[in-house]
Design a protein with these regions (language model features):
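Charged, flexible boundary elements
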Residues: 1-17, 145-146
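Gly/Thr-rich phosphate-binding beta-strand-loop-beta motif of the actin/hexokinase/Hsp70
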Residues: 13-51, 98, 165-175
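Short glycine-rich phosphate-binding loop at a beta-alpha junction
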Residues: 25-26, 84-93, 142-143
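Short loop/turn segments at strand-loop or loop-helix junctions that form parts
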Residues: 30-31, 53-59, 90-95
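Extended mixed-charge, aromatic/glycine-enriched low-complexity segments
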Residues: 36-38, 42-45, 51-62, 72-81
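Glycine-rich phosphate-binding loop and adjoining helix at the ATP-binding site
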Residues: 55-72, 96-169
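Phosphate/pyrophosphate-binding loops at sites that engage ATP/ADP/AMP, CoA/4′-phosphopantetheine
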Residues: 74-87, 130-136
Length: 175
């Protein structure tokens, strides 16, 4: 087995076979310093509109958090999007083992985040539990992707139906 200085963790996140239409999805970007969230609404033609964008501090940066506190802060950060969609696309910028159901098991934190009890947890499942505790309607699906995969899929999606390329690259330079 070859070794590498880069984590190469497989993903089960593929581009959708067809563009979403007439629906909304909650989108989260949890990075090294910031936690961003918004609602993305697709019209009848599949064009996306971003609304209700908020940026807060990433939980666990200011002090060490327990697992419960970590996901509780996620739920608080998402309160402005409560019950506005039943699916979540989650760009989580930390190494995860992506599962076939779209969830991700956290392998470890990098950067400044301090929440050691979260390591080994299914991030999407824990988030669903925290949202339910805040009175959210049932979330049907949370799809986890790391930042590089998210960049790759976004680039492929932006190409649209009229521009197809032989390959795509997702590239994250610094944070």
């Amino acid at each position: 087995k070859e070794t590498s200085d880069q984590d190469m963790i497989r993903t089960f996140c593929n581009p959708p076979k067809k563009s979403a239409t007439n629906e909304s999805v909650i989108v989260i970007d949890a990075g090294g310093t910031n936690f961003r969230s918004c609602l993305v609404t697709f019209d009848a033609a599949g064009a996306a509109t971003i609304s209700e964008m908020e940026k807060t501090r990433m939980p666990g940066v200011e002090r060490e958090l327990s697992r419960k506190e970590f996901f509780e802060q996620f739920a608080v950060n998402l309160e402005h999007l409560k019950n506005k969609a039943d699916r979540i696309g989650f760009c989580f910028s930390y190494p995860m083992e992506i599962q076939k159901d779209g969830d991700g098991i956290l392998l470890g934190f990098s950067k400044e985040v301090k929440a050691p009890e979260v390591v080994g947890c299914k991030v999407g499942e824990c988030l669903k539990e925290a949202l339910a505790a805040h009175g959210w309607n049932t979330i049907k699906r949370i799809t986890m992707c790391n930042d590089t995969v998210s960049a790759l899929l976004a680039g492929a999606a932006c190409a649209g139906e009229t521009h197809r390329y032989s390959s795509y690259i997702g590239y994250i330079l610094g944070t």
